[in-house]
Structures are given as structure tokens and as C-alpha cells.
Amino acid sequence: MSEIRLIRAINDELYLVEVQATLERKADSLHIGDLKIIKEKNSEKKKATLTVGNQYMEGVVESLKKPLAVLQKTNADPVDVYSSPSHELKCCSIIRERIRFSSRPLPTK
């Protein structure tokens, strides 16, 4: 089962995260794990590590062929009494890269 999530990095850029597993978290917390994105020296490639509990996964950062827009739907007030309520879509961000974790989790060192 493949699970896809959106995360916000330190530089406020959104990434699409693709994991070939199910991630669990405590019911009272939104925190799942720690994600680190590392740019390789002498290269434009980026790698990522995700630590969840006592396991970690290694992944790669890839550019998306087509960027994705993150939209927020809001209810707009009707213009007059006779018009029906309408909805507005606001573009919050553009996702240009994804982080793909395709291997099984490994125990932390």
C-alpha cells in the first residue's frame, strides 16, 4: 500500500512524500517523525532521511514532471439574498518536488 502525504520543509517549500508503508502516530500528536533533506556535495541531487521511532528510511528527492497546486476551498458570502452560496479556491502553494521512500525501514544506528 502506498501512502502519500504533504509536508512543509524548513524553507517553507512543500514536498510530496511517497512512502511504501503505513505510518502510525500517537492519537494526541500530529508529529510522525523527523525528516531531513540533504544536498549532496558537488551535485544538484538531494537525499532525504525519515526517522520514525527506532527506524529510519532513506529516500531521494525528485522533480515532478508537472507541478501540483495546493488549493484551499472557502465558502464565499452570497452577493444578494437570491443568489446561492458560492465557493472560492485559493492557491496556497505549488509543489515542484517529491520525496520517494521506496525501501523498507531500517533500524536506527
Swiss-Prot record:
Major subcellular site: nucleus
Any Pfam family: Ctf8
GO molecular function: ATP hydrolysis activity; DNA binding
Single biological process term from Gene Ontology: DNA replication
Keywords assigned: Cell cycle, DNA replication, DNA-binding, Nucleus
Highest taxon listed in the record's lineage: Eukaryota
Subcellular location: Nucleus
Family to which this protein belongs: Belongs to the CTF8 family.
Function noted in UniProt: Essential for the fidelity of chromosome transmission. Required for the DNA replication block checkpoint. Replication factor C (RFC) complex has an essential but redundant activity in sister chromatid cohesion establishment. An RFC-like complex (ctf18-RFC) is formed where ctf18 replaces rfc1 in the RFC complex along with the association of dcc1 and ctf8. This complex is required for efficient establishment of chromosome cohesion during S-phase. Acts as a PCNA loader, loading PCNA onto primed templates.
Subunit details: Component of the ctf18-RFC complex which consists of ctf18, ctf8, dcc1, rfc2, rfc3, rfc4 and rfc5.
Record protein name field: Chromosome transmission fidelity protein 8
Organism lineage: Eukaryota, Fungi, Dikarya, Ascomycota, Taphrinomycotina
Gene coding for it: ctf8
